Structures are given as C-alpha cells and as structure tokens.
Amino acid sequence: MVLLQTIAHAKINIGLMIPYKREDGLHEIRSVFVPIDFGDPMEIQIKSLPKGIVSRFVFHSTNHLQGYRHSLFEAVSERGDLSQNILTKTFHKLKPYFQEALEIKVQIQKHLPPEGGIGGGSSNAGVLLQHLFPYTNLSRGEQIQFAKSIGADVPFFLQSSACFVTGIGEVMEPIRLAKGFGILAIPPFGLSTGSMYASLQKSLQKPYGSEVWKSLTEDLIRSLHVGDWVYLQNRLENEFEKIAFQTQPLLKELKLGFFESGAIFASLSGSGSCLYGIYPTEEKRNEALPNVSLRFPKMEFRTFSF
C-alpha cells in the first residue's frame, strides 16, 4: 500500500490573451501560469487488489468553502452525486489503463473555489493523475493528452513550475520567476468559464492566424526573472478583465483597492472571478491584508507566495 500526503496547489495567470478560436471550437490561449502555495490538502492511498477484483475509488471530503460554492461542492461530493466529481470522472477514465486492479482512496480538504479561475478542480485532477500514471504504461506525451481530455488546465498541474502556456493549456514552456508575495481575493460570486469565453466572440481562425504572444519577448522574460511587476502591469494583461468588470463592477473596484493598498501588480486570474494583487515585499503584503479586508468585507482573502 502507498500512502501520499500532498497539496493540490492553485494557479494564477499573469496575463491571459485569447488570440483566436480554433477550428475544433476551442480557444487558443497565451498566458503565464504560476502555481501558488494555497491549495487543497489531499491524502491519496493506493492499494493493489487481488486478481479478479475490479478497481474501485473511495472519496471522502471536508468542505471548507463558503456561500454558494459550499453547495456547489456538496452537490458533487460523497454527500451528493459523486459521479459528477472531477476526481471520480478522472479515475473511471484512467481505470482501463491500470496494469493491475487498484483501490484508490482520496481524502481532500476543500478550500479552492470553483468558478474562481485558479484551477480548483483541475488542480485536484492533476495531482491524482500524477500519482496514478505510474500504474499505467502511458508515455509522457500520452499522459499530457489524457490530462487534456479531463480539462484544458489539467496538464499544467502534472508539474510544479511556472510556465508560459499556449495551445488550449497543454503546451508548456517552464520559466524562471522571481519570488512574489500576493493576496488572493475570492468573491462571493463566480464567473462561468463557458459564458466568459462566449462573451469574447473570437472569430474562427486557422492555427497560424495570429502571431501575437507566440513567444515571450526578451524584455518580458527578464522582467519575470527579476520581478519587475510595474513594467509587466501594462504588458501582460488579462483579456477577460473588461468582460468581468462589466459583469461584476465590484471586481474593478477591487483591483483599484489592491493598488491603493500598495500592490505593484494586480489582475483577474483566468476567466475569474478570483482577483489578486502582488506586493513588493512580504511585509508590505501583510500590512495590506487588513486594509483590503476592511474595505471589502464580503470578500474572502488569502495570502500566498510563489
């Protein structure tokens, strides 16, 4: 038996551009994905079963989410319809590839919010796959494609480095990033990824239809290396922000609030609704936390670093 204690980390997006809609109906992206030290603690137990026994999945969870998100997770937990949980779906899809019958038990402390743009479900699935792929014969390339079939962000969570990400999220180039200290805001409302992408109304183009953000320029790479966030602020923007701010004006006020509290970079993460601010030092970040918490009492705030 193998017993693993791990954390499914959230990610933030530093810049997010969607240059075009692909012929397969999915959207091409350009973004820097960064794993942060806020996540869901997970315990994974893997046990071999005797021949003739079918592989099985056991799931237990503690729900730490607030507001409507608490109900969303309950609905797909062992207290609701577990067949709709991303981890259950991941297990059953991977089960035919196991080289032996396995019993997989997962226990999770759920903190990462759905509809937040920080990879709440994708992170859980990615961590589970990391530990189950060794029980298959899938090559690295096949693992990436399998993870992609679970969700566009899932391949990123098979590894732990910040990456420049293209494709629909499966093409990753590791990059070196300066240490950063931030505050993550979790609003009491979510933004549907599907609705946000639909609102972009991107035209259908062939894969070679845009050269924008095809690669990071030397000045952007240097700025990410040294942490020149002021330089990056107006150069790595999230294309979803305009739509998010129109849909939920409080998010625009929140971004301004981060800057007024001393942040040197602030952005929506993914398609939202989570928004974050990055501060010059850990001390400045800690000083800002009570200020933004007081100004936005309905928000949940989490400090993070990377």
Swiss-Prot record:
One of its GO terms (molecular function) is ATP binding. It is an enzyme of class 2 (transferase). The keyword 4Fe-4S does not apply. Keywords: ATP-binding, Isoprene biosynthesis, Kinase, Nucleotide-binding, Transferase. GO terms for biological process: isopentenyl diphosphate biosynthetic process, methylerythritol 4-phosphate pathway; terpenoid biosynthetic process. Gene3D superfamilies: 3.30.230.10, GHMP kinase, C-terminal domain. Pathway: Isoprenoid biosynthesis; isopentenyl diphosphate biosynthesis via DXP pathway; isopentenyl diphosphate from 1-deoxy-D-xylulose 5-phosphate: step 3/6. It comes from the Bacteria. Its EC number is 2.7.1.148. The active site is at residues 11, 153. ATP binds at residues 113-123. It catalyses: 4-CDP-2-C-methyl-D-erythritol + ATP = 4-CDP-2-C-methyl-D-erythritol 2-phosphate + ADP + H(+). Belongs to the GHMP kinase family. IspE subfamily. Catalyzes the phosphorylation of the position 2 hydroxy group of 4-diphosphocytidyl-2C-methyl-D-erythritol. This is 4-diphosphocytidyl-2-C-methyl-D-erythritol kinase.
